[in-house]
Amino acid sequence: DSGGLTPPHADCVPGKXQXNGNYGAVPNKKQQ
């Protein structure tokens, strides 16, 4: 991952969590 925003994953629900690469759905936070 480049550390930026990644496209939503199938396991990630909009407004709930954000898919960060293959890490799965993670909280909507700016983690770098």
UniProtKB/Swiss-Prot annotation:
Assigned keywords, A-Z: Allergen, IgE-binding protein, IgG-binding protein
One Gene Ontology MF term: IgG binding
Chain intervals for the UniProt region annotation (Disordered): 1-32
Protein name as it appears in the record: Allergen Asp fl 3
Organism listed in the record: Aspergillus flavus
Organism lineage string: Eukaryota, Fungi, Dikarya, Ascomycota, Pezizomycotina
